[in-house]
From Swiss-Prot:
A motif (Q motif) lies at residues 90-118. It comes from Pyricularia oryzae (strain 70-15 / ATCC MYA-4617 / FGSC 8958). PANTHER family: ATP-DEPENDENT RNA HELICASE RHLE-RELATED, RNA HELICASE. This is ATP-dependent RNA helicase DBP10. CDD domains: DEADc_DDX54, SF2_C_DEAD. Its EC number is 3.6.4.13. The gene is DBP10. Residues 121-293 form the Helicase ATP-binding domain. ATP binds at residues 134-141.
């Protein structure tokens, strides 16, 4: 019997009962379709075979089976409507985003939010001010773009921008614009880009199109704000992207002026890779009860990271670096084997090559990043490593942005194995998972070390960090050991078993390899004049760096003297295995004694040790030794210092014993406040007599200590003014993560522009400070006061916008809050989003006039004739032009020509007949 066609149902939720009547025609087909429809879903525990087989027992079984199948299919459709996927909650679907934005996120390839996105997006959607701090490349841009698009939704017909994103550089602004365009494809939001280097007239046109989102650099945006007298009262959403770089590049004045013009009801977000102290003060002033979001709060260093610290001499660091690359990492020379050049680099459709590594994969097996102190170290080490045959990329703060992008892209694609950078440059670079990190110049702060090694051992992968520690770096190593709370293993100490992942393992490198590499480096320096000049500059830069870096603690400095003087300091590192042969150790010890040998004789006494005649100079030196007292050595002075500290300790103990009856202890007070060492200054007297009578001047009844006796500090703190607010919590959290990074070019403070502070005054024939020019005290540069009171350049208000508006015949523009009007013809709607084209780089210039003395005279003459015929450039307003109104210059020129002709002809003009 042939199968009958199914009768149509009114909706997909209704059941076609005719199918159950003819279900026995092809029972196997029905079972196959049922299994296909329900395969792979566990939402309903349904035994389909049992239901279908129930048709043999009675007629009602088929109806129940098919009804159950239809209900299961309907249930699956309703559960998959949100987000168009059947994924579990916990991703972007659980954040309450609109469907068009979810589709854009899925189209972008984001499946699960990154940790910074998971923590910050809910806070931003709740209209909270956020200070986001995360590792580079963790998705900070999407963390503030997604909530911005969710909040703005669509283009507003009311005049006034609603979102402002400040970026430190043109390249970063372009990158942010690209992300905004990709996430806002399902909306009609208008976005404009305002960066330096573009035409001001074009940007005037962009701002008159009523954009919703402004992505700008501080300098150009402040220029447009002053020139156009922009009203920023409609701004609701402000983002400072890479805020640490904004302050480092000297935009503090511009940011202060812009921040003063924003409404107080705005939502302010501040995202940064690091958190300098100046940025903390800016956040306190510009943000309201901010929430600090950071990712390194639970663990300081990844547990999968293994570290090795090598004790080296300052003059042998280049050889030690080559020894690590050759023998420890075993890095091959030349271009990596797996790298292939992209054949279709010129194709616009190809955005990613097939050989480009994934973001969670290492570019190469031996990918290594080397951190140095200054940009001069970067250039010098790059030249040395290139001479050694390695594929090297480099980057530093003063490097051109395009060159930096090319260098980092080569490293990311696997074209090079090594990237030599400074802390300033590496902070804003998106670097994937690395295999190794080498600290060529040891960091002066433990937080900087954590920031450096945080680029490896990501996503559950193993990683190594290698650090070169010289004698002057030993105090900083001990500070790092205390900060990490790890055990210090020096030399061949195998008593408790060294663990490279949980201990600070210190030792020396293999002496033979270092000497070979040092000799090779000296040979390269002698043969290359350029490298020799670089080395001389590096020596000066190293002195300046050591002079300006943060000092280590005094206790670590005392411990470092003992550490460097010990025998274990020069013992081989445990990474090379346990050395049972003491020959190498004895050799190193002998060389150390020879290098530290200091003869007791002077130059006058050399060669006069025999029984012969003694010269007069020798007799004089003997008499001087008898008269002069024996000088104390450095170790004796240290011992005396330690002896002087003993009474102070006794005094502290006596103070503690006298306060034992108090209800609150001073140690508890310090623990509750948790102040940093820089904010507290303790002055202790070394007078032994006062230490003996420490308790004599205290009166137990009337003496007032700086710690409360009868009150609970925790309770008082709970009743404090800032109790219950997020301001105090932000300050406490920011105190732990605040970190200042040393400049890689000059020793200027963070936030100061990196340029010379003095200039030559020709009039007075002397050097004067540039600060006088910037604040307007000198008459060279005219300054005006902004709305916040700071002085800005008077050139910002030059009248160019008024002239542009007059040339384009624009009247009064609508104010903020008014309904937008249609744009004049030819404006094009300028901008980058939501309709409207951008007319850039299409200006047609007329060719130059033909020169009779040039070989191409006839060619030029022909091109000029064509330009006159086509009305191009300056020939646009010739005879027969639609624009017949002449300007003042044309009228003045025509009158002058007419007067000259009249003088030449010597006769009056011809009068018209009536």
């Amino acid at each position: 019997m042939p199968r009958r066609a199914a009768s149509p149902a009114a909706s997909e939720h209704e059941i076609d009962i005719l199918g159950s009547i003819f279900a026995n025609d092809n029972d196997t087909e029905v079972k196959a379709k049922a299994k296909k429809r329900t395969g792979g879903h566990d939402e309903i525990d349904l035994d389909i075979d049992a239901l279908l087989n129930g048709a043999e027992d009675g007629g009602d079984g088929d109806d129940e089976a098919l009804i159950a199948l239809q209900q299961a299919a309907s249930f699956r459709k309703t559960t998959n409507l949100k987000g168009k996927t059947g994924k579990k909650s916990g991703g972007f679907q659980a954040m309450g985003l609109n469907p068009s934005l979810l589709q854009a996120i899925t189209r972008k390839g984001f499946a699960v939010p990154t940790p910074i996105q998971r923590k910050s997006i809910p806070l931003i959607l709740d209209r909270r001010d956020v200070v986001g701090m995360a590792r580079t490349g963790s998705g900070k841009t999407a963390a503030f773009v997604i909530p911005m698009i969710e909040r703005l939704r669509a283009h507003s017909a009311r005049v006034g921008a609603r979102a402002l994103i400040m970026s430190p550089s043109r390249e970063l602004a372009l990158q942010t614009l690209k992300v905004v365009k990709e996430f806002g494809k399902g909306t009609d939001l208008k976005t404009v880009l305002l960066v330096g280097g573009d035409s001001l007239e074009d940007q005037f046109g962009f701002m008159t199109t009523n954009p919703d989102i402004i992505i700008a650099t501080p300098g150009r945006f402040l220029h447009l704000k002053v020139e156009m007298s922009l009203d920023l009262s409609s701004i609701k959403y402000v983002v400072f992207d890479e805020a640490d770089r904004l302050f480092e590049m000297g935009f503090a004045t511009q940011l202060t002026e812009i921040l003063h013009s924003l409404p107080p009801s705005r939502q302010t977000l501040l995202f940064s890779a690091t958190l300098p102290r100046s940025l903390v003060e800016f956040a306190r002033a510009g943000l309201q009860d901010p929430s600090l979001v950071r990712l390194d709060a639970e663990t300081k260093i990844s547990p999968d990271l293994e570290s090795a610290f090598f004790s080296v001499k300052g003059a042998e660091k280049e050889g030690a670096l080559l020894h690590i690359l050759q023998d420890v990492i075993k890095m091959p020379t030349g271009t990596p084997e797996g790298f292939k050049e992209d054949k279709d680099e010129g194709s616009k459709k190809r955005k990613r090559g097939p050989d480009r590594p994934n973001a969670k994969e290492k570019p190469t097996e031996h990918s290594t990043i080397i951190f140095t102190a200054t940009k001069f170290h970067v250039e010098y080490l790059t030249s040395i490593l290139v001479q050694a045959g390695y594929a090297v990329s480099h980057a530093y703060g003063a490097l051109d942005q395009t060159a930096r992008k090319i260098q980092v892209e080569d490293f990311r694609r696997g074209k090079t194995n090594i990237l030599v950078v400074t802390d300033v440059a590496a902070r804003g670079i998106d670097i994937p998972v690395l295999a190794n990190v080498i600290n060529y110049d040891f960091c002066d702060q433990p937080k900087v070390f954590v920031h450096r090694v945080g680029r490896t051992a990501r996503a559950g992968q193993k990683g190594w960090s290698y650090s070169l520690v010289s004698d002057i770096d030993a105090p900083y190593l001990l500070d790092l050991q205390l900060f990490l709370g790890r055990r210090l293993v020096v030399g061949q100490d195998t008593s408790a078993g060294a663990n490279f992942a949980s201990d600070v393992v210190l030792g020396a490198l293999q002496r033979n390899s270092i000497e070979t590499n040092v000799e090779w480096v000296e040979k390269v320096v002698q043969e290359s004049h350029d490298i020799a000049l670089m080395r001389s500059v590096v020596v000066k830069a190293q002195k300046q760096y050591l002079r300006t870096r943060v000092s280590a603690s005094s206790q670590s400095a005392k411990r470092a003297r003992e550490l460097t003087a010990s025998r274990a300091w020069s013992q081989p590192h445990l990474i090379f295995g346990i050395n049972t042969d003491d020959t190498e150790a004895l050799r190193v010890e002998m060389l150390a004694k020879i290098s530290g040998f200091k003869p007791q004789e002077t130059v006058f006494e050399i060669g006069h040790g025999g029984k012969g005649t003694i010269s007069e100079a020798v007799e004089v030196m003997k008499q001087l030794r008898k008269r002069a007292p024996v000088r104390k050595s450095k170790t004796d002075k240290d011992a005396d210092d330690e002896d002087e500290d003993v009474p102070v300790i006794k005094r502290a103990k006596s103070d503690e014993s006298s306060d034992e009856d108090a209800s609150f202890d001073e140690d508890d007070f310090v623990a509750v406040n948790d102040d940093s060492d820089e904010e507290l200054e303790v002055t202790v007297s070394n007078n032994a007599d006062s230490a003996k009578n420490a308790s004599a001047w205290r009166d137990s009844e009337h003496f007032m200590t700086y710690t409360p006796r009868q009150s609970n500090v925790a309770e008082e703190r709970g009743y404090g003014v800032n109790a219950g607010s997020n301001g105090a919590n932000f300050l406490e959290a920011a105190r732990d993560v605040a970190m200042d990074i040393a400049n890689d070019e000059k020793s200027t403070s963070f936030g100061a522009p990196t340029r010379t502070t003095m200039r030559w005054d020709k009039k007075n024939a002397k050097y004067v400070s540039r600060a006088h020019d910037e604040d307007g005290s000198r008459g060279n540069t005219k300054m005006i006061r902004g709305e916040s009171g700071v002085k800005i350049a008077a050139s910002f208000k030059s009248g160019r916008f008024d002239r542009w508006r007059k040339d384009n015949r624009l009247g009064k523009l609508p104010g903020v809050g008014e309904a937008e009007t249609g744009l004049p013809r030819g404006m094009g709607g300028g901008g980058f989003g939501g309709g409207g084209r951008r007319f850039n780089h299409k200006r047609e210039d007329a060719p130059k006039e033909a020169d009779k003395f040039r070989d191409d005279y006839h060619v030029r003459k022909k091109r000029v004739a064509e330009a006159k015929e086509k009305r191009i450039g300056k020939f646009r307003d010739g005879e027969g032009s639609k624009r017949e109104i002449k300007n003042n210059d044309d009228i003045r020129k025509a009158r002058k020509i007419k007067e000259l002709k009249m003088r030449k002809n010597a006769r009056p003009a011809r009068k018209k007949k009536n």
